[in-house]
Amino acid sequence: MTKVESTSGEVSEWADLNKDILELIFNKLDVMDITMGASRVCISWFLASHNKTLWNTVDLTNLQELDVSRIFNFKDKERPIFFYKHPVDHKHGLTNLLTKIISRFFLDFFEVEGSISLMNLLVEISKLSRMAPKNLFFNFNSYIQENGLKFAAEKMPNIEKLALPIWCYQNEKSLRFAFSQWKNLKTLIIAHEHSFSGRFDFKAVGESCSNLTNLKYLGRLEEYTSREIVSYLHSLKRLSLRCFLVSSIAVYRFITGLPNLTILNVSHCKNPYDYFLPIAKSIDNYVITAATQKLEKFITCPHDCMICKDRCRYSLSYLAEVWRNDEIKELEF
């Protein structure tokens, strides 16, 4: 292949690529590559980047974080704003970009540089995806500011599967607006830590998302949280509490209080009152009996589970690596 230079003549060669080849290239790229790179090569690539099939899923889970840009205060606590690497604003311009795209396509290598905030990235994505996305997955450590969540909900109202990160500080008004837009939501994955972000408004979810049947909750499950889930999410059929802290009382509450629940996953969970004790070893017999009588599947881990024995696996860094995994297939992403 000849060396690519940033001249109009050679750009036209890229513009004239066969549509099938262009489709292969775009399918090889991720959201960041398309939004901040390929869509800016030439007009034909820009038009191709609007293809709805590219935007069924907006997957931001693999964004590579740069150093925190600055610290801001939120409710007397300091919180980070993350920026992400992307393949533009490089001194070599188009030549460098095309080289990276071809390297990614043929060699599975794509180095990215520069930075962009999450809010600005959502703006750029919405210009190309329009209202096509049905799945929206944030990076585990992303911080979604209030206007960012509102913007995502307004521009992507057809979301059916959503993964919200642990740094998601929202007031009641912003959550209510967001979920009022996501009326088609079927699956919700929440990485939530009460000490970081306060209470999550499950009432706002329940009032707007009548089609929600799948929920995954990662975090220390407070008793009030389990009561709210039972009170407001009556349509749940599948619930996963994988890899965190939950009590026998809460498990029993879910089994008996959620009328449509068929599958409950408590694998790798620990007792919140004894971090050394896996829930599988501490769960009471009355809970087992209730699960056996009602549920189609009650997922626990074996008593000799190596994950449960490793306390380091319950750190946030570990959860950031595994939160996409689940024994319930509907909750994988």
From Swiss-Prot:
This is Putative F-box protein At4g11580. Gene3D superfamilies: 1.20.1280.50, Ribonuclease Inhibitor (3.80.10.10). It comes from the Eukaryota. Residues 11-58 form the F-box domain.
